[in-house]
């Protein structure tokens, strides 16, 4: 037994929690102080092992004082073996100081802020403005402010403070592999030398020694002003005098068992050897008394500097990469820290773990939804720590006896031992080698093997969202030949798994607390609803859907014997009444697994039901995908997780048993359609083909009727409509009992589009969002004519898959398939990175117990989570009929007439408190709430053709009412008092049970008003479904029934609120990231505009990066009320918007020398140009006297283009003179244009007339100093940059569309109206505000930055939510508003726009470890050291790094236990003997007995 005590642990050791980690620069003195090498020179031997005794060389790079990594050696510093020695630092004393490459940029900035002569700050530190500037700033912010001030200083010139030396510009020079800091004066004494050439500024090389001397003289006060803490980080410590040698443990040398064999040293050890050799060479070179050339010392020093630089970072620009003898690039210190495989992300944030398994998954129809089948070989290797108690000692003793080989057994035993000194320890016994029995005692720990019922975490990578890791119960498979995990098919959707070779991971929790949390929180049976969409995520799949469809068809009859056999596989009770000796319907059989009391009604139309369930009995409807999802959703919200899981398990087992008996198959004959249908499809294709040809001919005859893009989109839509018609035709003509029809109709597999392509026609192939493009030689493929736009040439495939593809059709199909493969490959990398950025941005945001949402440092992100404080898993879609009701309907359906009130009072159904005035007041309130919600919807989407009636609610009162109405027995003789109903409605949304925000009713008036605003939608919903008239006349509630609804509401609303400690940021990041992975890479067509805008992944990246230059800037211009139906005004405004220069209308331009402008045979006479612009503007403006202007820029214009853009000669002359007069005010013009302007002395413009046959413009000018380049640049400037009309950045504005929108008349009726909307490409809201006719308050654009700059952060936040939602939905994705709102709040909570990338992360108030775990790991850690930052272990990343529990979820609170009360409650329980319950004979039992007797 002694041989088994090979490892041990201290049970009594306490693990302290890390409260704070402070960063500082490791000073040269500190390096010496912490070094294990006593010799002042440190490590001096560039050797590893002694060749004589194979021991580490004394004073070498693996000196035993630095630690040991071989088991037979002992550390000379701590005396421990390799197992216990932590390792110790050493040092190398450098002959010359060298730069630390990580701090070089900071040295540059610091030296730029101080005088290199007197070593003082360039700014006078006692000036008031300096003190005010840095008053509330620390660290980086303060240093940035000082740097910006010092950039403006030219001399160290403050009287009685500075020395008058010119300030210097510091730069880093890495030429020829050397590393220098260069200083050159920023102020030149002489601008030019005697020859007129620019005088070179003198440069000074700042060596590390000189920099060290300068920085050492900087005072502590100046350090503090610059943002440094001199107690932690003095600037001179950024220069290395003593080089720290890392312990051997982080760079172990590998040696074979034969001691004389060569070693394999770590890359860092190789670099240390190079550093020592270079340092010793430099020492010898400097120490030699002979005359030594300066270049030799410099070369040796630069080699030492290079080796030190590549030790820290071996991939710096400008420096050669360090290599070993075998040409392998050395892995530096920084490379070990950063990146996915680095120490931070690879070993601290995530790591390999014990007690985990991975193998392929296979489906198992008999395993429960929350179970996982575990192979026996895995169950015998994974263990759970079971503490021995008096209750389980016998059971665990038996497991220990079984050992590791006999299942179920145990693998290890940890015996609790107390030594003579009172120290507690645990001796570990490996049961594989035990040859004697082990006696267990209470307190011992047995690592037993997995058994049935153990809780594990099941995971499939990539873990994109919360449901990628869920808890399951083990079900051990007792067969050594079965080696895969067994999984229920229905649970694969959240994992995004299938059974084509997917592998999944299994993790075993190692404590009862962890297992309990997994069981109660992460259990698969409790994770039915997706937080991203609030919809059921775990659904019935494939065979279950198909079998349900077949079983519930109206004519399906099942033999009663089969029915009983089928139900035996479910959890249905044995006493269910199944009629014998007669067939039963499939609906009846299915009803047996539906919970009793469930009521659902979904209508297909006024006469037919799509689904009807009453009190758990399925009476109407054939169950497909949507119907079963509706059932699951209702069971989940009405009954809970247990019943929902039972329904899925029972449905799957029942349907599989049903299919085994009744069968299902798909064959080729299922896809065959009749000859008439084929002819119909052929005729339809021919009709569309001819329509396409006719449209092409029309466009060719008049190409100005629309743009090329609009033409292509119209053709594409016309041809795509063929597929819709064909798929509907094929589905209508399929045999309703064919396998393929059943598969598609049930939602089990495939879509109608697939059926249409299989049996009808493949249709239009789309590549890159368009028809097949004409590319090589004007053709799509060589067999088509040039520039052929017809259907077949551009990718329309008329054949079906049954008929087979032609050669060109096959090629087109392959093109589309190739695009899909490429998009998937690109999208995988992009979306993965987007999700990571989202997680790092939002990971610290959580719900606090005060109702607010805050980050790790307590900064407020949102006052209320998602604007309603409701957990997204606890909300359901509810329709509010009041929104669409007109005034008359509100009067009839929601409030009483006077006669009805009198009747209620007369029959004592209400007292006199419900008066006519109260009734009228209720009517006005309902109308007011309805109109307010309508106005809000109009403001949200001004051009929407529909309005929203369905909203997410935390309660489903309508379903609860439906359940009450469908009760068999109701006590509704006395209806509820309507006054009581109104009173309780007010109590429901104002009461403390439904309070969302935490506030004091007396003092928090503002919060109270916010609470009303937040619950406004809830208020409308309550009045809509519980209006007094509905309660008394429609539902006919008794008071007891109405009170049930009130109690249900209060209980549900309490449970629906988001819990304190919920990491809502993490959930939001995952809920947004997961649908982003489903988005496409392309743009989408904006209906009616003939244009495409960025959508999908491209737009998501723009929004998250807060891009200032978006790919498709669009402005949707709404006209003022009086012009919204005036197309002429809309066209006039649109024509003015487009930015137009002379280049847009020019045909030809020349520069001509014409010294005699008024000559009879001159240029002006020839061109008919005599219309001089005679508006006198002084010498700086356009001139009227052109005699002394010999140069002419002759511009010939296109008359057609001028007419198209509504431009005349007067506009050209006016705009030219305006541009010329303000030429010196344009700060955005190019430098070469400014030089041209300086050379042009005078300018004038002369034109012919609007009715001239060829419009010609002469721009005459003179120049004091010109050459050919000057003339060319002047021509380019006038033609390309001088604006004639329009608004800057607006590149197109001729898209005027007539859009429908929803409005309401005076009686509250919904009215569809139309208005003209201008779609402009480009954005410039500030200039648009100057144009009459544009309603700028309703005009919208898709540029978040522009909105922020014009309207502020709140407008930008709203616009971001709208644009981001549209970007996701453009590709069919969806994410709840709450998640996008959290993202928008995180981006805008600091008052500006914070991009979701590393630049945005640096702006956030986060701790160093949190920033380092994202990107630029080494740079972040170095910055933290420079500014002496502290990490207070508040962020998620920091706490994971140090192995601490995060401050979220179950880790954000503590449990207090009163031991005295527990002791007082302990009582001895007497042994209880349960009475024997006699078996009652049932039908099944009688059948079995009679069957036995008959035998």
From Swiss-Prot:
SMART domains: RPOLA_N. Pfam families: RNA_pol_Rpb1_1 (PF04997), RNA_pol_Rpb1_2 (PF00623), RNA_pol_Rpb1_3 (PF04983), RNA_pol_Rpb1_4 (PF05000), RNA_pol_Rpb1_5 (PF04998), RNA_pol_Rpb1_6 (PF04992), RNA_pol_Rpb1_7 (PF04990). InterPro entries: DNA-dir_RpoC_beta_prime, RNA_pol_asu, RNA_pol_N, RNA_pol_Rpb1_1, RNA_pol_Rpb1_3, RNA_pol_Rpb1_3_sf, RNA_pol_Rpb1_4, RNA_pol_Rpb1_5. Keywords: DNA-directed RNA polymerase, Nucleotidyltransferase, Transcription, Transferase, Virion. One of its GO terms (cellular component) is DNA-directed RNA polymerase complex. One of its GO terms (molecular function) is DNA-directed RNA polymerase activity. It is found in: Virion. GO terms for biological process: DNA-templated transcription. It catalyses: RNA(n) + a ribonucleoside 5'-triphosphate = RNA(n+1) + diphosphate. Belongs to the RNA polymerase beta' chain family. DNA-dependent RNA polymerase catalyzes the transcription of DNA into RNA using the four ribonucleoside triphosphates as substrates. This is DNA-directed RNA polymerase subunit 1. It comes from Acanthamoeba polyphaga mimivirus.
């Amino acid at each position: 037994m002694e041989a088994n005590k090979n490892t041990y642990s201290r049970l009594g050791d306490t693990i302290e929690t890390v409260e704070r980690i402070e960063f500082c620069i490791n000073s040269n003195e500190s390096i010496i102080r912490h070094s294990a090498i006593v010799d002042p020179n440190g490590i001096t031997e560039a050797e590893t092992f002694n060749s004589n005794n194979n021991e580490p060389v004394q004073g070498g790079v693996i000196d035993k004082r630095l630690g040991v990594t071989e088991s037979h050696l002992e550390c000379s510093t701590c005396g421990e073996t390799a197992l216990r020695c932590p390792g110790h630092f050493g040092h190398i004393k450098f002959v010359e100081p060298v730069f630390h490459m990580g701090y070089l940029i900071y040295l540059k900035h610091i030296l730029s802020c101080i005088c290199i002569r007197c070593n003082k700050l360039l700014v006078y530190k006692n000036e008031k403005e300096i003190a005010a500037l840095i008053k509330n700033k620390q660290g980086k912010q303060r240093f940035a402010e000082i740097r910006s001030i010092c950039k403006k200083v030219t001399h160290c010139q403050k009287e009685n403070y500075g020395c008058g030396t010119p300030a210097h510009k510091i730069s880093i020079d890495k030429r020829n592999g050397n590393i220098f800091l260069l200083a050159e004066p920023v102020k030149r004494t002489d601008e030019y030398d005697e020859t007129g050439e620019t005088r070179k500024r003198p440069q000074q090389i700042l060596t590390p020694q000189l920099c060290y001397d300068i920085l050492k003289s900087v005072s502590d006060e100046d350090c503090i002003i610059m943002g440094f803490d001199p107690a932690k980080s003095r600037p001179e410590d950024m220069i290395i005098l003593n080089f720290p040698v890392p312990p051997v443990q982080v760079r172990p040398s590998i040696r074979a068992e034969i001691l004389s064999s060569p070693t394999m040293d770590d890359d860092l050890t190789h670099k240390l050897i190079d550093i020592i050799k270079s340092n010793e060479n430099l020492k010898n070179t400097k120490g030699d008394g002979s005359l030594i050339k300066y270049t030799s010392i410099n070369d040796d020093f630069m080699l030492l500097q290079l080796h030190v630089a590549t030790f820290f970072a071996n991939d710096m620009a400008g420096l050669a990469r360090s290599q070993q003898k075998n040409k392998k690039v050395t892995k530096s210190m920084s490379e070990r820290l950063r990146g996915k495989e680095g120490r931070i992300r690879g070993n601290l944030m995530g790591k390999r773990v014990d007690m985990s398994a991975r193998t392929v998954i296979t489906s198992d129809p008999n395993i429960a939804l929350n179970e996982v089948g575990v192979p026996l070989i895995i169950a015998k290797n994974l263990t759970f720590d079971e503490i021995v108690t008096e209750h389980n000692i016998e059971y665990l003793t038996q497991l220990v006896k079984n050992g590791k080989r006999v299942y179920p057994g145990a693998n290890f035993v940890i015996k609790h031992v107390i030594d003579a000194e009172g120290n507690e320890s645990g001796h570990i016994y490996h049961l594989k080698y035990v040859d004697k029995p082990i006696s267990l005692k209470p307190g011992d720990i047995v690592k037993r093997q997995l058994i049935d019922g153990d809780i594990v975490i099941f995971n499939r990578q990539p873990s994109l969202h919360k449901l990628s890791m869920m808890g399951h119960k083990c079900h051990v498979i007792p067969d050594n030949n079965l080696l895969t995990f067994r999984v229920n098919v229905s649970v694969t959707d959240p994992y995004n798994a299938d059974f084509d070779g997917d592998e999944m991971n299994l993790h075993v929790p190692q404590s009862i607390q962890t297992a309990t949390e997994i069981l109660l929180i992460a259990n698969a049976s409790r994770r039915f609803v997706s937080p991203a969409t609030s919809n059921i995520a775990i659904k019935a799949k494939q065979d279950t859907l198909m079998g349900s469809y077949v079983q519930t068809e109206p004519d399906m009859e099942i033999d009663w014997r089969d029915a009983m056999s089928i139900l035996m596989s479910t959890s249905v009770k044995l006493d269910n009444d199944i009629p014998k000796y007669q067939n039963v319907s499939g609906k009846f059989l299915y009803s047996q697994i539906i919970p009793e009391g469930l009521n659902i009604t979904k209508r297909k139309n006024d006469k037919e039901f799509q689904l009807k369930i009453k009190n758990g009995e399925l009476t109407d409807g054939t169950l497909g995908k949507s119907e079963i999802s509706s059932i699951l959703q209702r069971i989940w919200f009405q009954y809970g997780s247990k019943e929902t899981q039972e329904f899925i398990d029972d449905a799957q087992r029942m349907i599989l048993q049903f299919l085994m008996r009744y069968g299902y198959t798909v064959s080729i004959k299922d896809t065959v359609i009749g000859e008439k249908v084929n002819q119909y499809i052929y005729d339809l294709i021919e009709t569309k083909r001819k329509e396409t040809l006719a449209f092409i001919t029309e466009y060719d005859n008049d190409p100005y009727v629309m743009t090329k893009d609009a033409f292509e989109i119209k053709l594409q839509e016309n041809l795509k409509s063929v597929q819709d018609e064909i798929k509907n035709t094929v589905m209508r003509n399929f045999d309703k009992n064919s396998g393929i029809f059943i598969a598609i109709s049930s939602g089990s597999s495939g879509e109608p589009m697939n059926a249409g392509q299989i049996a009808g026609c493949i249709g239009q192939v789309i590549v890159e969002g368009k028809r097949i493009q004409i590319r090589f030689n004007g053709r799509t493929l060589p067999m088509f004519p040039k520039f052929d736009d017809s259907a077949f040439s551009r990718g329309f495939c008329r054949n079906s898959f049954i008929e087979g593809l032609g050669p060109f059709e096959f090629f087109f199909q392959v093109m589309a398939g190739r695009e899909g493969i490429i998009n998937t490959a690109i999208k995988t990398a992009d979306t993965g990175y987007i999700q990571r950025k989202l997680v790092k941005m939002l990971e610290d945001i959580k719900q606090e117990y005060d109702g607010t949402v805050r980050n790790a440092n307590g900064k407020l992100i949102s006052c209320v989570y998602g604007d309603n404080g409701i957990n997204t898993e606890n909300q359901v879609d509810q329709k509010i009929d009041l929104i669409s009701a007109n005034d008359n309907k509100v009067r009839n359906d929601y409030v009483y007439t006077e006669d009805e009130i009198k009747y209620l009072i007369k029959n004592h159904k209400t007292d006199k408190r419900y008066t006519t005035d109260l009734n009228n007041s209720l009517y006005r309130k309902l109308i007011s709430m309805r109109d307010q919600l309508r106005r809000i919807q109009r403001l949200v989407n001004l051009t929407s053709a529909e309005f929203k009636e369905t909203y997410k609610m935390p309660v489903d009162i309508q379903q609860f009412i439906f359940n009450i109405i469908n009760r068999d027995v109701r006590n509704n003789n006395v209806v509820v008092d309507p006054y009581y109903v109104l009173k309780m409605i007010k109590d429901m949304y104002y009461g403390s049970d439904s309070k969302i925000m935490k506030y004091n009713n007396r003092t928090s008036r503002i919060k109270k008003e916010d609470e009303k605003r937040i619950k406004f939608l809830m208020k409308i919903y309550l009045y809509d479904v519980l209006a007094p008239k509905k309660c008394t006349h429609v539902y006919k509630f008794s008071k007891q029934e109405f009170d049930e609804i009130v109690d249900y509401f209060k209980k549900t609303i309490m449970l629906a609120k988001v819990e304190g400690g919920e990491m809502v940021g993490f959930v939001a990041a995952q809920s947004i990231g997961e649908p982003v992975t489903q988005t496409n890479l392309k743009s989408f067509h904006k209906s009616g505009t003939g244009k495409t805008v960025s959508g999908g992944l491209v737009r998501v990246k723009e929004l998250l990066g807060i891009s200032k230059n978006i790919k498709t800037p669009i402005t949707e211009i709404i006209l003022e009320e009086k012009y919204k139906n005036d197309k002429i005004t809309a066209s006039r405004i649109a024509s003015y918007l487009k930015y137009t220069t002379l280049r847009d209308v020019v045909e030809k331009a020349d520069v001509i020398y014409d010294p005699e402008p008024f000559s009879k045979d001159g240029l002006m006479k020839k061109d008919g140009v005599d219309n001089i612009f005679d508006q006198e503007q002084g010498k700086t403006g356009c001139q009227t006297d052109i005699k002394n202007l010999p140069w002419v820029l002759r511009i010939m214009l296109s008359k057609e283009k001028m007419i198209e853009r509504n431009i005349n000669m007067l506009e050209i002359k006016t705009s030219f003179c305006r541009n010329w007069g303000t030429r010196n005010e344009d700060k955005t013009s190019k430098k070469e244009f400014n030089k041209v302007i300086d050379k042009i002395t005078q300018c004038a413009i002369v034109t012919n007339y609007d009715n001239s046959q060829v419009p010609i413009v002469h721009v005459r000018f003179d120049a004091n100093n010109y050459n050919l380049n000057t003339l060319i640049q002047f021509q380019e400037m006038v033609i390309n940059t001088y604006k004639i009309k329009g608004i800057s950045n607006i590149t197109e504005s001729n898209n005027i569309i007539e859009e429908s929108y929803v409005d309401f008349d005076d009686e509250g009726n919904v009215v569809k109206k139309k208005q003209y909307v201008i779609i402009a490409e480009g954005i410039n809201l500030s200039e648009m505000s100057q144009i009459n006719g544009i309603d700028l308050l309703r005009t919208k654009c898709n540029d978040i930055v522009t909105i922020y700059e014009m309207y502020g952060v709140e407008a930008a936040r709203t616009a971001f939510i709208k644009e981001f939602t549209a970007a996701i939905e453009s590709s069919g994705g969806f994410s709840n508003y709450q998640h996008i709102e959290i993202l928008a709040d995180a981006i805008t909570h600091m008052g500006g726009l914070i991009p979701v990338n590393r630049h945005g992360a640096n702006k956030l108030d986060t701790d160093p470890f949190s920033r380092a775990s994202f990107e630029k790991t080494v740079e972040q850690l170095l910055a933290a050291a420079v500014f002496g930052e502290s990490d207070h272990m508040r962020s998620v990343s920091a706490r994971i790094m140090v192995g601490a529990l995060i401050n979220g979820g179950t880790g954000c609170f503590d449990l207090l236990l009163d031991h005295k009360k527990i002791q007082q409650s302990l009582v001895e329980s007497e042994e209880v003997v349960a009475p024997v319950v006699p078996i009652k004979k049932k039908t099944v039992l009688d059948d079995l007995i009679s069957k036995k007797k008959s035998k």
